[in-house]
Curated annotation (Swiss-Prot):
Name used for this protein in its record: Protein-glutamate methylesterase/protein-glutamine glutaminase
HAMAP family, alphabetized: CheB_chemtxs
Signal peptide range: none
Catalytic activity: [protein]-L-glutamate 5-O-methyl ester + H2O = L-glutamyl-[protein] + methanol + H(+); L-glutaminyl-[protein] + H2O = L-glutamyl-[protein] + NH4(+)
Species of origin: Yersinia pestis
Enzyme type, top EC level: hydrolase
Alphabetic keyword roster: Chemotaxis, Cytoplasm, Hydrolase, Phosphoprotein
Subcellular locations according to the entry: Cytoplasm
Active-site residues annotated for this sequence: 164, 190, 286
Domain Response regulatory: 5-122
PTM info: Phosphorylated by CheA. Phosphorylation of the N-terminal regulatory domain activates the methylesterase activity.
SUPFAM superfamilies noted in UniProt: CheY-like, Methylesterase CheB, C-terminal domain
Similarity comment: Belongs to the CheB family.
GO annotation, cellular component aspect: cytoplasm
């Protein structure tokens, strides 16, 4: 079996050395070359034809975003960004995902060597996922036509969405067409702490609905989307007649916190047939069991189709478990969700 060929682009000699050690410690991949800046990387890409590129965000001569934009236009390939955990860099990382990066890794703030080596399995998993990924289609910067939707008379209706690899842009594609009269949405996207606030703020600028990072105890309102904070579970709860957000630090589920299964199970319990469940692109099986619970509770459930997924893992598992009513292309999901909510026919078997 041939190894995954990886090229590292980072201006730090230590980071290049550590990434080389990490990649070469896994038998199914190899570091074919390492470059200190994008201009050197350009020549090495031609020479070694890597399958996956790891790219630092901040570098001299040409920054990572400029290089990524040119790369995706001229020679599209799977890219995993490597970013320091700062407010500025979290915004840059979100922009990189918009430009077509598959995923990202955060650099440890202290103890670089020990921290990076501790991330060895995580980095290897992201490299493997990137190597198999379908390159995402760019979502246009201009806003798509807003869907028409009759204002709801009840705040009982609710939409739950789960995603992982490739999910930031898929979520954007689903939320942008939604009108302000849409039902509330609860969203779990696998993401580390420090990035979900930037993700929510960026979506809020692009969408007609209000998008925010979820806060424990807040009331769930129509026309609002609530994003699970990084490294914390998001659940639906009730306070009297009202839906409420619950945020907690429970153990990881399916190796993830936040976990899509945790969200979906709570929605099955408290919203039942008043809910719509949507599982989007992502590696693994998180969300499959929870979506089945939603389906059994009477919710209408959707999975993104393989052709429009960056990674057809989570949707595939959900379909295989029998918890999916319909499999839909990404650009049709918004319309299908609202049509189902408006029809009032959440239960479909």
């Amino acid at each position: 079996m041939s190894k995954i060929r990886v090229l590292c682009v980072d201006d730090s000699a230590l980071m290049r050395q550590l990434m080389t050690e990490i990649i070469n410690s896994h038998p199914d991949m190899e570091m074919v070359a390492a470059a200190q800046d994008p201009l050197v990387a350009r020549d090495l890409i031609k020479k070694f034809n890597p399958q996956v590129l790891t790219l630092d965000v901040e570098m001299p001569r040409m920054d990572g975003l400029d290089f990524l934009e040119k790369l995706m236009r001229l020679r599209p390939m799977p890219v995993v960004m490597v970013s320091s955990l700062t407010g500025k860099n979290s915004e840059i990382t979100m922009r990189a995902l918009e430009l077509g990066a598959i995923d990202f890794v955060t650099k440890p703030q202290l103890g670089i060597r020990e921290g990076m080596l501790a991330y060895s399995e995580l980095i290897a998993d992201k490299i493997r996922t990137a190597a198999k990924a379908r390159l995402p289609q760019r979502v246009l910067e201009n806003k798509p036509a807003m869907l028409s939707h009759t204002p709801l008379l009840s705040s009982e209706k609710l939409i739950a969405i789960g995603a992982s690899t490739g999910g930031t842009e898929a979520i954007r594609a689903v939320l942008q067409p939604l009108p302000p009269t849409s039902p509330a949405l609860l969203i779990t996207q696998h993401m580390p702490p420090g990035f979900t606030r930037s993700f929510a703020e960026r979506l809020n600028k692009l969408c007609q609905i209000t998008v925010k990072e979820a806060e424990d105890g807040e009331r769930v309102l129509p026309g609002h989307a609530y994003i699970a904070p990084g490294d914390r579970h998001l659940e639906l709860a009730r306070s009297g007649a009202n839906y409420q957000v619950r945020i907690h630090d429970g153990p990881a589920v399916n190796r993830h916190r936040p976990s899509v299964d945790v969200l979906f199970r709570s929605v099955a319990q408290y919203a039942g047939r008043n809910a719509v469940g949507v599982i989007l692109t992502g590696m693994g099986n998180d969300g499959a069991a929870g979506l089945l619970e939603m389906h059994r509770a009477g919710a209408y459930t959707l999975a993104q189709n393989e052709a429009s997924c960056v990674v057809f893992g989570m949707p595939r598992e959900a379909i295989a478990m029998g918890g999916v009513n319909d499999v839909v292309e990404l650009n049709q999901i918004s319309q299908r969700m609202l049509a189902q909510i408006s029809s009032g026919q959440a239960l479909r078997i």
